[in-house]
């Protein structure tokens, strides 16, 4: 079943907790405020944006950053589509820095950093990498890897070392 958030009542609330390593998607209608909260610190929420009426209209990270002369996303910034329309704006931000350039983790990155894991061994404690999680959610809307776009990583600050490598 597709989750849809509608701006029907200013007092209505929908709350869901998303465990680390899991994935979820929702259709957010115009006029809805979506609040993300890092309950324990150290969270990262990877998020992609599409026009629900015309799925070929997608989030455009380069234009989002370029037109606002910024590298980070924070309060006051807007997220733009590849058609030049605003998908959403950041109206409040207590973290102060969210990035949209580093993408998401692939299976080989996760395995290299944390070791190989699979459902057969870990059962319900198994966690999927970001790339494969996005593919699962895209499939729910009839999309595949060709529809993968840049994502925003909420609660993730990125800086550069002396050699220009992003860390």
Where on the chain are the PLM-derived regions?
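Acidic, Ser/Thr/Pro
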Residues: 1-167
């Amino acid at each position: 079943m597709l989750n849809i958030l509608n701006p029907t009542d200013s007092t209505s609330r929908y709350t869901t907790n998303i465990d680390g390593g899991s994935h979820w998607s929702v259709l957010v209608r115009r006029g809805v405020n979506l609040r993300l909260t890092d309950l324990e610190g150290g969270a990262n929420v990877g998020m992609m944006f599409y026009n629900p009426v015309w799925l070929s209209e997608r989030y455009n990270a380069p234009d989002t950053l370029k037109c606002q002369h910024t590298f980070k996303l924070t309060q006051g910034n807007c997220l733009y589509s590849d058609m030049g329309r605003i998908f959403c704006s950041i109206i409040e931000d207590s973290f102060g820095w969210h990035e949209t350039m580093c993408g998401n983790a692939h299976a080989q990155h996760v395995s290299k950093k944390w070791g190989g894991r699979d459902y057969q061994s870990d059962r319900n404690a198994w966690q999927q990498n970001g790339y494969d999680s996005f593919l699962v959610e895209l499939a729910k809307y009839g999309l595949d890897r060709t529809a993968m776009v840049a994502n925003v990583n909420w609660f993730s600050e990125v800086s550069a070392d002396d050699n220009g490598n992003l860390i």
